[in-house]
């Protein structure tokens, strides 16, 4: 148990000597203030290393709000940080926790293919994109008719989706 403490103290002494040496190479310090500078630098490094250890312990103790296996359903993804349900998790993670999907996966030990969007939501968006003709190569539109055709396609696609929702709701 004393070994890590000695190693940490030794490390702080080395860092103190480096920091003070670098400071003295660019600044003039009276000899009377030198001892105070060394002491303040050492104490600052010690308090920083203690804060880092406390932070690491807090990170290690954190547990997911729900079991990982239950966090993915067809209709929503449950955030492991706070247990809230979302169709798309990416925006919530960045806004509330400042985490990217990759950082979130690393933090919780999730596989690289762990979804950030509920499967039913992704499927609905894919259907809408296909109905709008996205992903297909455009043909040269006739003068004046291209804009009308595009808006007609959008209206037809929206109507098809609305009809599906009505029939799904009635079933």
Curated annotation (Swiss-Prot):
The keyword Transcription applies. The keyword Transcription applies. GO terms for biological process: regulation of DNA-templated transcription. Signal peptide: none annotated. Keywords: DNA-binding, Plasmid, Transcription, Transcription regulation. Disulfide bonds: none annotated. InterPro entries: ROS/MUCR_sf, ROS_MUCR. GO terms for molecular function: DNA binding; zinc ion binding. Lacks the C2H3-type zinc-finger found in all members of this family. Belongs to the ros/MucR family. This is Putative MucR family transcriptional regulatory protein y4pD. It comes from Sinorhizobium fredii (strain NBRC 101917 / NGR234).
């Amino acid at each position: 148990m004393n070994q890590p403490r000695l190693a940490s103290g030794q490390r702080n002494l080395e860092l103190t000597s480096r920091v003070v040496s670098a400071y003295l190479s660019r600044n003039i310090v009276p000899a009377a203030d030198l001892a105070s500078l060394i002491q303040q630098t050492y104490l600052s490094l010690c308090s920083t290393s203690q804060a880092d250890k406390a932070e690491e312990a807090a990170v290690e103790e954190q547990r997911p709000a729900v079991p990982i296996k239950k966090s993915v359903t067809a209709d929503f993804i449950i955030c492991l940080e706070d247990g809230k349900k979302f169709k798309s998790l990416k925006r919530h993670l960045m806004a509330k926790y400042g985490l990217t999907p990759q950082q979130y996966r690393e933090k919780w030990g999730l596989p690289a293919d762990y979804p950030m969007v509920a499967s039913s939501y992704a499927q609905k968006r894919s259907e809408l994109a296909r109905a709008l003709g996205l992903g297909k190569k455009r043909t040269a539109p006739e003068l004046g008719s291209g804009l009308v055709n595009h808006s007609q396609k959008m209206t037809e696609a929206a109507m098809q989706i609305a009809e599906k929702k009505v029939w799904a709701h009635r079933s």
